[in-house]
Amino acid sequence: KLIRPSQGSVSLFHSTSKSEWTHALKRVGSVIETPVALNHLNARQNLRYYCKIHHVPNPDNVIDEILDTVGLGHTGKKKFRSFSLGMKQRLGIAIALIAKPDLLILDEPINGLDPVAIKEFRQMIKKLSEEQGMTVLISSHILSELYQVSTRFGIIDHGQIIREITKDEFEHLSEDYIVLKTNQLALASRILQDQLHQHFKVVNSDNEIHIFDKSHVIKAIVKELVKQEVEIDEIYYKRQDLENYFTQLVDSERR
């Protein structure tokens, strides 16, 4: 325990007391953002080292199984220091799997990964969940990737869980919204707010405005913007994604 709790309580596998937690924590594995391993050892040697720490019997059989699960069976004598970021992440997860956890906690596991490594990560997480029945808790700000591997979402703002929702519930609630692309974001925003009274979000990085109030159809919005001499690059309907849902929810909570 790093700090004493200020309030509230935590239950892990129905365990709440200090003595129960000691046993419950043995059922948990974790990788906190940056995987830790010995630079001068290869994947198999690193796993053998951690198997000794955990007093794992017949470690070679366990190591073969884990390397196959995380897709590192081909790395041979390659040292950890020479691994790509994706390979390091997979070895970190492999180390966490040595104790055969029922719960695996991953903090920002896809930060810095390339598209191929992200796809491999998704496949690995689904495999752990579907084939081994493992619960995987992922903390990440890359919501589009979370959506592809998760079945339940907890949305946190300023340290508080403000909403829990299943994937099925989200898909039932999600709606189309209007995407407006223009270089005149300030002028378009002012018109949407003052003349059309729309609920919207500005995405400066993409020169986009996302319009959520569908009381006005695209035709009416285009008509008013053109009248006010706003240059429209694109305007179209799009299905709401988890990122927009998150932003809307947080904005409404802060009002």
Residue ranges of predicted features:
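Short, charged/small-residue-rich alpha-helical element at the C-terminal edge
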Residues: 176-249
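ABC transporter nucleotide-binding domains
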Residues: 1-138, 143-157, 161-163
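Conserved beta-strand-loop-alpha-helix hinge in the C-terminal portion
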Residues: 160-181
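Short, flexible turn/loop "capping" segments at secondary-structure junctions
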Residues: 4, 170-173, 201-203
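ABC-family P-loop ATPase nucleotide-binding domain
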Residues: 252-255
